[in-house]
A protein has these predicted regions:
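Catalytic center-proximal scaffold of phosphoryl-transfer enzymes
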Residues: 1-246
Length: 246
C-alpha cells in the first residue's frame, strides 16, 4: 500500500520535501535513543507520503525519488542536491530565508538591516496573498510576481551582497545573509515556474504532528517499527483506515 502511494505521488511534477528527527530505541545496549529521521514528500494541498530512515544522508531521498524528474522544493538541505533524474529542478523556500533574518532581529531588536530584510520578504508574500484573494490562476500569479515581486527579490539579493561585506560572518545577520546568497539560485527559481509556491510551509506543517508527538510517545520502539510509523502517518493523511487494511 505504501509503495502504491509513493508511485502515485511520483506522478506529480512538483513536490515539496522536509525531514524531522524521530528518536528510536536501538536495543544495542547503549541505552540512548538513536536520532533517526522521518522524511516527508508531498504535493502542495494534496497527497503526502512519509519515509523512515535511520540517517539524514542523501541515501533516503535517492531511494524514495529514484529517477523522478520534476520540481522539488526544500529548505535547501544539501542532501536534496544531486538526486533524482537529470531534469530534476531544485527550488528554495523564501520563508526559510526570512526566518533567518527574524532570528537576527530576535538577537538584536534594533538591527535595522535585519528588520528591513524581513519587511522586504514580507512584501513578496503579500503579492501571493493578493493572488489568492483574487483567486488567480498559477499563470496569473506568476505574471503578478514578475510585475512586482521579482524586482523586489533582486533588491534583496543586492542588499545581501552589500551586507556580506560589512557584517560578521558568524553573527545572526551574517548567517542570514550567507544563507540567502547561498540559496539564491534556488530562491530565484520560484519566479520561473507558475505552480511553485514561495514557501515550503505546507511540507513543514505536515510535520508538526510528528514534532508534537515526540513529546507524547518519546521515541519509536525499534528500527523495524520506523517504517510502520511512516506508513501510518501517510495513511492518516490519505484517510486510509490502517486497521481495516492491515
Amino acid at each position: 500500500m505504501v509503495e502504491a502511494m509513493r508511485q502515485d505521488l511520483l506522478r506529480a511534477s512538483y513536490l515539496q520535501a522536509d525531514e524531522t528527527i524521530v528518536p528510536v530505541q536501538m536495543h544495542d545496549g547503549r541505552g540512548a535513543d538513536h536520532q533517526a529521521y522521518l522524511w516527508q514528500y508531498g504535493k502542495p494541498g494534496g497527497e503526502t507520503v512519509f519515509d523512515f530512515q535511520l540517517g539524514r544522508g542523501r541515501e533516503g531521498p535517492i531511494k524514495f525519488l529514484g529517477q523522478w524528474e520534476g520540481i522539488l522544493q526544500t529548505d535547501g538541505y544539501q542532501a536534496y542536491d544531486g538526486i533524482g533524474g537529470p531534469k530534476l529542478v531544485h527550488v528554495g523556500c523564501w520563508t526559510h530565508a526570512r526566518r533567518k533574518f527574524v532570528d537576527a532581529v530576535k538577537v538584536n531588536p534594533q538591527d535595522g538591516e535585519a528588520i528591513k530584510m524581513v519587511t522586504r520578504m514580507d512584501a513578496l508574500s503579500l503579492v501571493d496573498r493578493h493572488a489568492r484573494e483574487r483567486q488567480m490562476s498559477d499563470e496569473e500569479r506568476l505574471a503578478l510576481r514578475h510585475e512586482h515581486a521579482e524586482s523586489w527579490a533582486e533588491e534583496i539579493r543586492s542588499e545581501c551582497e552589500t551586507l556580506s561585506r560589512a557584517v560578521l560572518p558568524k553573527s545572526a545577520l551574517g548567517q542570514a545573509v550567507a544563507y540567502t546568497l547561498n540559496m539564491w539560485a534556488k530562491l530565484r527559481r520560484c519566479f520561473d515556474y507558475a505552480e511553485v509556491e514561495l514557501s515550503n510551509n505546507l511540507a513543514e506543517n505536515s510535520m508538526r504532528p510528528v514534532a508534537l508527538g515526540r513529546k507524547n510517545w518519546l521515541h519509536v520502539g525499534s528500527a523495524k517499527s520506523g517504517p510502520k510509523v511512516a506508513a501510518i502517518r501517510g495513511c492518516r493523511i490519505f484517510c486510509v483506515n490502517v486497521l481495516r487494511n492491515n
